[in-house]
Structures are given as structure tokens and as C-alpha cells.
Amino acid sequence: MKGIVAITLVWGSISAFGQTRDFQLLRIAPNFISSPQFTYTGAQQYVADLRERWLEVEVTLAAAPEFSDELTVKYFILFNGKLLTGEVTHTNIPAGRENRSVIYVTPKTLQRLMLGRTVTKAALQNITVQLLQKGVIKDEMTLTRAPMQWYAAMPQTAGLTLNKNETPFAPLYWDRYLQVKTAR
């Protein structure tokens, strides 16, 4: 009987270690980028100020299920002492390790947060990203080492981040990013 219990305990621990997570964050890549430039006819064209930069936060994630109907990526961005929050809900998530989500902060918002000072990379203090499915956290990753849920006690500012479809980057690299779920 002791042998059966021992085998069961060993098998149970092996199977627990052998389980894979449905979703896993692999990388957080922040970048400061300029607005895309488009040429068109039929109206007056305006040149964007190429010195102004958007904050782009790209996340790479792995998905184990063949397809998932919905996955929410929640972002916590600490920029110049202000905690910005935003989320993007994706649909039709395929299995694989090259799935990407992205969120943006406009140049005007960054200028506002800098209180008139020049926007610098040093102002980006930290980023945490969570993957949620049906409200359950599936994974969490932080850009720089910090205590667990460092953002929880801080005042949060929502509404200052944009998903890709809400930016001038919407038509670019369509097949690089997961499909954004639209409200209907």
C-alpha cells in the first residue's frame, strides 16, 4: 500500500510539473517612435512633427490552445511618477509563441505627464502587463525588477492609452498583431 501511495505522489508531482500554461508573457518591449508619414491626394497635407514621440509598448506572448476566443492584455505603465492603465481585448488568438499585443501613449499625453519638460526614456520607470481570460489572471510580467503588484497601492489614471486601432498606426503591420476586439 505504501508503494502505491508513493507512486501516486510521485506521479501527481510529475504531472503537475508537466502541465503547460495556456498563456505566457515572453517579452515587454517599450519604444519611443514618431508618427507614421502618409502621402495622399485630394486635400491639403500636413507634416507631423517628427521630434514628437509616441510611447509604444509591445508585448510578445505564447498561447497553448489551438485557438482562443478572447484574451485581455492589461497594461500598467509608470511614467514620470504617474501610473497609466489600459487594456486591449483580443479575439481569435492562435496557438504559438509569436503573438503580439501593443498599446500606445500619444506625444501630447507624454508632454502633459512631463509637465512641459522634454520627454526622455528615463521618464519611463516601469511596466507591468497581465494576461486575463474571463477575468482570471493567466500570467503577469514586469519590465524591471519590482515587488509583486507594485502598482496596486498607487493612484491609477485610465483613459490615456490607446489600442492600435485608435492610432495612426492602425493600418500598419496588420498581420504582426493580434486582432483587437471591437465593441458592437
Pin down the residues of each PLM region.
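Short, compositionally biased P/S/T/A/G/V-rich stretches that sit at domain boundaries
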Residues: 19-50, 160-184
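Short beta-strand elements
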Residues: 92-94, 133-184
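Extended low-complexity, serine/threonine- and proline-enriched intrinsically disordered segments
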Residues: 69-87, 125-134
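Contiguous beta-strand segments within globular domains
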Residues: 44-61, 68-70
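Hydrophobic beta-strand positions in extracellular immunoglobulin-like domains
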Residues: 60-63, 77
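Bacterial N-terminal signal peptides
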Residues: 4-15
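Short glycine/proline/serine/threonine-rich loop/turn segments at secondary-structure transition edges
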Residues: 111-126
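Solvent-exposed serine/threonine-rich low-complexity stretches and specific carbohydrate-binding patches
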Residues: 83-108, 142-149
